[in-house]
């Protein structure tokens, strides 16, 4: 049976032109060469086909290098496979019940971790931060509107708060929150399929200075079109005032819409001409190195049109209409109308001109409430409604109908058809297009501009924007994740930066400059409006004055300040705002200067990135791993010190389960090495220095057993956190919780067949291995891997020599030694050698050193050596029935070598006679003379004989 799309579980779909059969053939050849499974089905129309494939990081790079040279590739879709799709749906479903709650930081981190789209995640991070900052602004506006004893319009307290809020928000975003997210979202090289296809024909890279000079040449063009738009806006404003307040002829209700129709028609037409004949040719002449830079240049050039069309109507009303409306008296109107014969023939009012005092309120309410509702509907509902209406009016698209009939012949299953329909929606549906980040940033910043410039008119505006943004966040999140065409693969493809790889510092770019400009301009406009209208002579505006009782108030100047004072006040506010902004910026910058310029300290290391597609319940910081390592190391050190105080002796370092604890133990002894012991890089260095010995000793045994060597296994298993050994691993007694709670069901886990304690034997073996490994690791940790074996030979005289004697050294014992070298290692942790230590003479030291050298050479060839932990009693040795003692000689010149006294007892053996104890002690003593690797094999045989 042929493979289905569902069983393939594709994570990539290639949309290509199938007009030529050679196109599909060339793709199949490349898929076969790279061993990529593929299924090719008809596309959404008769000219396209879909190639469903599943790729991974290894074969993705050569595949895209091949696709970049093909002209028939229309799009590459990083399709979400089953696992990723389930994770994203879970992430979205969590936020369904939190529509009116501010999004959490870890949710954004999980989003970036799953999609590997840092730019999109940064947009949601900006929106999240903006929402959180709107909360206090909204509550303050509500309190001013409903609880203040003064008028809420042009309130000085609200204006001061708005200015400080604006500067604080901008500074915190630029110097705290954006770097915060940039450090966490730009860890991986993101591969944009959109930029990949658009950058096929790469332009020759030009110097940035040349591009900047070419951009400056566009300034006169932008100023010209700005002047044209501003002039037309003033004309429409004058026409509106004339029709609504001066004209007294027929069709006033219909003609009143004429200015709005004119401005709504003229602005798009001017924008099309501006872009088609000036912006695009000039951008092409600038010759940018990538499509992204060219798009940014176009956005910057269009910003002039956007700013004028958005804010000029309110600026005209507040700075022209209200202050100067009183000048339009009957005499002036007569002179103006007589100058134009056409106007003189029109019927007009004979009464004096009275300004509309609520005009600015209506305009601001329209931009804050009605305009945002219209934009939200145009983005989310109108396209779908228009598509449905077109299908009912014109019928279904014939190309789509033929394509669906062709795909019907393929007889796809329901699950396969669901995947095919999803890919089709990416190509045809209104929501299927790639999520436009620039358009959404522009929408948010325009809203921000209205708030910081004109919210002193209506303090409820921040609360309205907060509600709107909470809804927009949920809708945009679903649109971007579930419906829009993905742009990035969830795994890195290009390791090095390229034109299609995003490894630079993550930033919103142009919109940061717009944010700063709006902040400074908003502070100036808010303060100036408050200065002008807080105590003006317009009824119902600002504070009430005595002139409000005068019926001829419209004939007097409504502003109590001269224009010179207003301009000087605006300049003063601008300087103060810039100074406060730079003050906030310098404070935030200084708080993030963790490492000074110059040489980076050795203990500052790069923390490994968390694995991709991992879900977190809180946002991890860059210092997350290293801080936890230090905490664990310090916690381990405090536990050791407590044990030392109780026992009056120091405990040896332990090593278990392939994890090294030597670095942590060394960190406890040397406080300056805490960070070094906890850093992953030095942990890896420590393991690599040990690898040389492990390779020479352990690889043969590990290879014969079909398992990974200890060094490889420990390297793979080691994570960034230090493993803290339990107290039981030190083999000391105390009021501690045992590793296995003793019950009747787990008796076989605690005792062997003969009733001997497994825990005591394991603790003795681990303690003994840790002692020798700690000594060897300390001496050779600075040596490379290849010199570890030679270093062991050179340092053999400096390693503490262990001499184990039991009774007479007769010929039978020597024969057993020879036989032990040929006996394979039997890993039986149930046998615990009982060894007591005492000081021997110098002659014993020499003989033992020679014997130990031979044993080390043999163990290096045959496998890992297992040393026996040695103890030295203070006054007397442990009593035994056969008075057998074990002599241990230790090199006094070795630094940091501690002698430990342990009392061993077998918990599982209670009915053992004196003869059996004597035999066991004798067997253990004679077996201890065997080479360290094979001692347990011989002990196991002796145990069976006994």
UniProtKB/Swiss-Prot annotation:
Cellular compartments annotated: Cell membrane
- Specify where the region named Disordered lies, as residue ranges: 617-638, 665-718, 759-784, 846-946
Q: Which UniProt keywords apply?
A: Cell membrane, Membrane, Phosphoprotein, Transmembrane, Transmembrane helix
Q: Which Pfam families match?
A: Anoctamin
* Keyword Cytoplasm in annotation: no
Gene Ontology molecular function terms on file: chloride channel activity; lipid binding
Ranges of Basic residues composition bias in the record: 895-905, 931-946
RNA-binding among keywords: no
Please list the residue ranges that the record places on the Extracellular side of the membrane.
143-153, 239-253, 324-447, 527-563
Q: Which InterPro entries match?
A: Anoctamin (IPR007632), Anoctamin_TM (IPR049452)
Name where it mostly resides. membrane
User: How does the record say this protein sits in the membrane?
Assistant: Multi-pass membrane protein
**Residue numbers carrying Phosphotyrosine:** 730
Modification sites for Phosphothreonine: 701, 726, 850
Q: Which residues carry this modification: Phosphoserine?
A: 638, 704, 720, 729, 757, 793, 844, 847
Q: Name one GO cellular component term.
A: cellular bud membrane
Q: What does this protein do?
A: May be involved in ion homeostasis together with BTN1 or BTN2.
**Assembly with partners or alone:** Interacts with BTN2.
Matching entries from PANTHER family are given as: ANOCTAMIN
Q: What is this protein called?
A: Increased sodium tolerance protein 2
Upper lineage is:
Eukaryota, Fungi, Dikarya, Ascomycota, Saccharomycotina
